[in-house]
């Protein structure tokens, strides 16, 4: 088995952890800047509390991102053996420029999986070759409460943070 990509759980979740830290830094920093210095009472209510309200909203986004990331992490990782059906280099408009994403569509014979990869990992993937992916499936924030059992299961499996890719025989 050739290891194509490997990352620890911390490495797999690093992008989410950076966003969480950024949200909490902005939210708590805004609250401290707004309410620690003495404000003159002559300022209008809206002007006095607008930064505080914005900071609370940013903190709310930080908390929801934390909960969603925690749910995904505690759900555990999943390992599937799949065959690559298609490699795609997708270019989308991002604000004023264009962003390129590298994706592989795979199947295990029952379900389809779409994995987003870095360019160097994507370059190592071969169409019609078999790989073993270990990943953390995405788990939405309120999935346990809002989602009912469906009699028609989805053909696509939501994929999330990849921790390991190995090339295996078909």
Residues covered by each model-derived region:
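Internal/C-terminal transmembrane anchor helices
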Residues: 45-73
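Short nucleic-acid-contacting surface segments enriched for D/E, G, S/T with interspersed K/R
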Residues: 118-134
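Cysteine-centric segments in proteins
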Residues: 42, 69-71, 76, 80, ...
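Structural detector for short beta-strands of small beta-barrel domains
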Residues: 74-98
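Membrane-embedded alpha-helical segments of integral membrane proteins
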Residues: 1-37
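OB-fold/S1-family single-stranded nucleic acid-binding modules
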Residues: 136-170
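OB-fold (S1/OB) nucleic-acid-binding surfaces
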Residues: 93-114
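Cytosolic-side transmembrane helix boundary signature
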Residues: 25-56
């Amino acid at each position: 088995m050739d290891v194509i990509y490997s990352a620890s759980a911390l490495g797999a979740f690093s992008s989410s952890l950076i966003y969480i830290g950024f949200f909490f830094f902005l939210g708590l920093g805004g609250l401290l800047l707004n309410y620690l210095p003495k404000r003159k009472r002559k300022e209008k209510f809206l002007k006095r509390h607008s930064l505080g309200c914005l900071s609370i909203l940013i903190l709310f986004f930080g908390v929801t991102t934390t909960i969603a990331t925690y749910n995904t992490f505690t759900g555990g990782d999943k390992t599937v053996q799949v065959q690559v059906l298609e490699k795609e280099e997708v270019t989308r408009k991002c604000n004023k420029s264009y962003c390129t994403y590298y994706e592989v569509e795979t199947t295990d014979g029952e379900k389809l999986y779409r994995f987003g990869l870095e360019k160097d990992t994507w370059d190592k993937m071969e169409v019609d070759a078999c790989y073993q992916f270990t990943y953390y499936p995405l788990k939405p924030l309120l999935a346990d409460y809002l989602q009912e059992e469906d009699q028609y299961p989805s053909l696509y499996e939501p994929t999330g943070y990849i921790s390991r890719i190995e090339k295996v025989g078909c």
